[in-house]
C-alpha cells in the first residue's frame, strides 16, 4: 500500500517528471541508467522501506526514462536480491532472526559454550552482510547483461559486457560500505548506507 501511495503521490505532484529529468541528464545510456536507477536507487528504496517498494517505484521510473515495461519490471525485481536481508531498516534480520529464534533455548546452549545471544546475533547479521555483499558484486553486471540480451535493440550479451568495468565499479561502491555497515553498525543500515555511498560516488 505504501509503495503505491508513494508512486501516485510522485506522479500527481510532478515528482516523477522531475526525477526523470534528473536521471536523463546524468546519461542517455540505458545501461548506466539501469545501474543508477534500478540498482543503486532501488537498493536505497529497499533499505529504507522494503516490502517490494523498489519494484513499485523504480520500475515506473525506468518506464518514464523510456525502458520497455517488461524490462523495467525485471530490473526492479532483480534489485530484490542483495539489499533485501537488510531492507525496511533491517526488519528481516531484526524480526526474522531476532524474534524468530527461541532465545531462551539458544541462550542456554550458548552459555554452555561460553557465549551469549548478542555474539551469535552479531555473527549472523555480519555473515549475511559479507555473503550478500560478495554476491552483490556481480548483480549489476547480470542485470545489465539480461537487459541488453532480452530487451536491447541488438539483443546482445556483448553490449552488457561492454559496461562490465562500470557495472563492477558500481557494485563495489555499494558492496564495500554495505558489508562494513553490516559488520560494524548493525542490521539497520547496510542497504541504506551502501546505496547512499554508491549514489554519491557513481
Regions found by a protein language model. Name each.
Residues 1-68, 74:
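Membrane-embedded alpha-helical segments and adjacent helix-loop junctions characteristic
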Residues 65, 71-202:
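Membrane-core helix-loop-helix motifs of multi-pass transport proteins
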Amino acid at each position: 500500500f505504501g509503495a503505491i501511495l508513494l508512486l501516485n503521490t510522485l506522479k500527481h505532484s510532478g515528482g516523477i517528471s522531475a526525477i526523470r529529468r534528473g536521471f536523463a541528464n546524468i546519461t542517455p545510456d540505458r545501461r548506466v541508467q539501469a545501474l543508477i536507477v534500478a540498482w543503486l536507487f532501488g537498493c536505497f528504496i529497499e533499505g529504507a522501506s522494503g516490502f517490494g517498494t523498489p519494484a513499485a517505484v523504480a520500475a515506473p521510473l525506468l518506464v518514464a526514462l523510456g525502458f520497455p515495461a517488461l524490462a523495467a519490471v525485471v530490473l526492479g525485481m532483480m534489485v530484490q536480491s542483495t539489499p533485501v536481508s537488510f531492507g525496511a531498516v533491517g526488519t528481516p534480520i531484526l524480526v526474522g532472526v531476532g524474534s524468530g529464534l527461541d532465545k531462551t533455548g539458544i541462550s542456554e546452549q550458548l552459555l554452555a559454550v561460553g557465549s551469549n545471544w548478542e555474539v551469535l546475533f552479531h555473527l549472523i547479521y555480519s555473515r549475511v552482510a559479507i555473503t550478500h555483499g560478495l554476491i552483490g558484486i556481480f548483480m549489476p553486471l547480470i542485470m545489465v547483461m539480461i537487459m541488453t540480451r532480452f530487451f536491447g535493440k541488438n539483443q546482445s550479451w556483448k553490449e552488457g559486457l561492454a559496461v562490465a568495468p562500470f557495472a563492477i565499479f558500481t557494485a563495489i561502491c555499494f558492496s564495500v560500505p554495505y558489508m562494513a555497515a553490516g559488520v560494524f553498525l548493525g542490521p539497520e543500515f547496510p542497504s541504506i548506507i551502501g546505496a547512499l555511498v554508491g549514489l554519491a560516488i557513481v
